[in-house]
Amino acid sequence: MTTEDRVEIYTDGACKGNPGPGGWGALMRYKGKEKELFGGERGTTNNRMEIMAVIRALAALNRPCKVVVYTDSQYVQKGISEWIHGWKARGWKTAAKEPVKNADLWQQLDAERNRHLDVEWRWVKGHAGHEFNERADQLANKGVESV
């Protein structure tokens, strides 16, 4: 399967102060077409905005799709592809038996992921000149400015 058969989603989160006002952004690409999404919250964290960007992008897809998500957040990439299995098995507790931070958003992200046929998670280095990741960053900053 080529990437042309998949929806590509580039996501980012931003926060002015952590916690503080924050924003999320997502650039969605499919067969030459693009859609930009962004939003913000007054009192939030960077990690919450990173997760929210992916939730909102996956939710914007009207039907089950094959998706590649690109994120510069190792927290998101590892959380959804590695850590979430243990969290769920332990009733949303960490290995240290502490409540999982942002469990509400992880649960939403898990539900959105499960709506789709296949979701692949790829980490990209942030602020390294990757065109589409830079655009997601700009959208996240627009989200901060919107609150």
UniProtKB/Swiss-Prot annotation:
One of its GO terms (biological process) is DNA replication, removal of RNA primer. Keywords: Cytoplasm, Endonuclease, Hydrolase, Magnesium, Metal-binding, Nuclease. CDD domains: RNase_HI_prokaryote_like. Its cofactor is Mg(2+). Residues 3-145 form the RNase H type-1 domain. Its main location: cytoplasm. One of its GO terms (molecular function) is magnesium ion binding. InterPro entries: RNase_H, RNaseH-like_sf, RNaseH_domain, RNaseH_sf, RNaseHI. Coiled coil: none annotated. Its EC number is 3.1.26.4. It catalyses: Endonucleolytic cleavage to 5'-phosphomonoester. Binds 1 Mg(2+) ion per subunit. May bind a second metal ion at a regulatory site, or after substrate binding. Mg(2+) 1 binds at residues 12, 50, 72. It is found in: Cytoplasm. GO terms for cellular component: cytoplasm. Mg(2+) 2 binds at residues 12, 137. Monomer. Endonuclease that specifically degrades the RNA of RNA-DNA hybrids. PANTHER family: RIBONUCLEASE H1. HAMAP family: RNase_H. Belongs to the RNase H family. This is Ribonuclease H. It comes from Chromobacterium violaceum (strain ATCC 12472 / DSM 30191 / JCM 1249 / CCUG 213 / NBRC 12614 / NCIMB 9131 / NCTC 9757 / MK). The lineage of its organism: Bacteria, Pseudomonadati, Pseudomonadota, Betaproteobacteria, Neisseriales. The gene is rnhA.
